[in-house]
UniProtKB/Swiss-Prot annotation:
UniProt record similarity statement: Belongs to the IQD family.
Species in which this protein is naturally found: Arabidopsis thaliana (Mouse-ear cress)
One function term, GO molecular function aspect: calmodulin binding
Sequence ranges of Basic and acidic residues compositional bias: 48-64, 277-293
PROSITE patterns: IQ
Region ranges (Calmodulin-binding): 5-20
UniProt entry tagged with the keyword Nucleus: yes
UniProt cross-references to CDD domains, sorted A to Z: IQCD
Protein name: Protein IQ-DOMAIN 11
Upper taxonomic lineage: Eukaryota, Viridiplantae, Streptophyta, Embryophyta, Tracheophyta
UniProt entry tagged with the keyword Lipid metabolism: no
């Protein structure tokens, strides 16, 4: 079986090799003829027409590809001829060389194909990038142009508005708005025409027409009258504006004065109410003290509290400003001479009134008499009166000064040497208390 296969193969090679050799000869002749025709064609063809860059680029590309294909075909045909020649030699060395050469040719063909593909693709990418760049540049130019136009329009509008405002301000300053002169001239022309028509129709009392001079005089008088009217109107308008402005100013001043006056009246009314309240509390305290002094001497002490006195301290007076009732027996009531002596030696006493009404803002005698607060703070709750400089005894009730009825003064501590204490005390540093006490005793 192996021998039969060898015979068939030998026969096939014989017949196929002859056929292939004939075809290859014909093919070679055809390729050489093609090359000769292409070499002769440039001399025969006419000059090319004007074409675009893209078309010319594509044509050049096609020509290069066709030339490369023809060259590769020629090289392949030569290689095939050499291979067929080498097949006749049956040496293995030549066969190895032929195989290596074929592999080398195949690699070259692959490299050429790869380079063609790469060049074509790179050219395509470059053209695409160039188109994109051109589009971007155009778009940027368009957008920038629009932005510049828009900015220019806005600036022009702003400038126009600023110019209009400036013209209005200048017109208001000069009080000559634009177009007043024009209106004034037009009104004057219209008035002149009316006056001429009126004068043409006027006649004298005897139905005789007026002369030219008389007509001109009438027109002039009417013009003067119209000018006077306009001046009077302008004067009235300007004075009205000035009067309105003055009235506004006066109204604002009047409102301010009214507000101040109302505030002062409110404060005064509050002060008066406080004074009325304090004056109402006075007579109640005085009536209570008078009743205690006017009680009959023969009245039994059993009805009264047995020798009990309520001694109120300064802290209790401050906490409860109400009047304090003091009950004393009849046999302890002092006579008139004792009262006079005690008045001469006693000091002003705090009346049972609220301390709030005796503040600087509410006191009615703040401009007349001023007593120091140190007297109020240093004064004790008990007042001791010296009887002939021997025995000291607390007073049954606190004496009241007749001259200082409007003041609440704290009780004072009287020492054995009364002259030293009383000589030092004074009211507003005008008169000493001893002289004042003497005058009160004489009264």
């Amino acid at each position: 079986m192996a021998k039969k296969k060898g015979l068939f193969t030998v026969l096939k090679r014989i017949f196929i090799s002859e056929v292939n050799s004939e075809k290859k000869e014909k093919r070679r002749k055809w390729t050489f003829w093609k090359l000769r025709i292409k070499k002769r064609l440039p001399s025969i063809t006419a000059p090319p027409e004007h074409r675009t860059s893209h078309e010319s680029h594509e044509e050049q590309k096609e020509e290069i590809v066709s030339d490369v294909g023809e060259i590769s075909q020629v090289s392949c045909s030569r290689q095939l001829d050499s291979i067929e020649e080498s097949k006749g030699s049956t040496s293995p060395e030549t066969a190895d060389l032929v195989v290596q050469y074929q592999m080398f040719l195949n690699r070259q063909e692959e490299v050429l194909a790869a380079t063609r593909i790469q060049t074509a693709f790179r050219g395509h990418l470059a053209r695409k990038a160039l188109r994109a760049l051109k589009g971007i540049v155009k778009l940027q130019a368009y957008i920038r142009g629009r932005a510049v136009r828009r900015q220019a329009m806005t600036t022009l509008k702003c400038l126009q508005s600023v110019v209009n405002i400036q013209s209005q301000v200048c017109g208001k300053r000069t009080q000559i708005p634009g177009g007043v002169h024009r209106d004034y001239e037009e009104s004057n022309i219209f008035n002149d025409n009316i006056l001429k028509v009126d004068t043409n129709g006027q006649k004298r009392w005897d139905d005789s027409l007026l002369t030219k001079e008389e007509k001109e005089a009438v027109v002039m008088s009417k013009k003067e009258a119209s000018l006077r009217r306009e001046r009077i109107k302008e004067y009235a308008v300007t004075h009205r504006k000035s009067a309105e402005s003055y009235q506004k100013r006066s109204n604002t001043k009047w409102k301010y004065w009214l507000d101040e006056w109302v505030d002062t009246q409110l404060t005064k009314s509050k002060e008066l109410e406080d004074l009325d309240f304090s004056s109402k509390t006075k007579p109640k305290d005085e009536t209570l003290n008078e009743k205690q002094l006017k009680t009959p001497r023969n009245s039994s002490p059993r009805r009264l509290v047995n020798n009990h006195r309520r001694q109120v301290s300064i802290g209790e007076d401050e906490q409860s400003p109400a009047a304090v009732t003091i009950t004393t027996p009849t046999y302890m009531v002092a006579t008139e001479s004792a009262k006079a002596k005690s008045r001469s030696l006693s000091s002003p006493r705090i009346r049972p009134r609220s301390f709030d009404t005796q503040s600087e803002s509410y006191s009615p005698y703040k401009n007349k008499l001023c007593l120091t607060t140190s007297m109020m703070s240093e004064a004790p709750s008990k007042v001791r009166i010296a009887n002939n400089g021997s025995n000291t005894r607390p007073s049954a009730y606190q004496q009241r000064s007749p001259g200082l009825r409007g003041f609440n003064i704290g009780p004072l501590k009287s020492c054995n040497n009364n002259n030293t204490l009383l000589n030092d005390l004074s009211i507003n540093s005008e008169r000493s208390l001893p002289s004042w006490n003497k005058q009160s005793s004489l009264r």
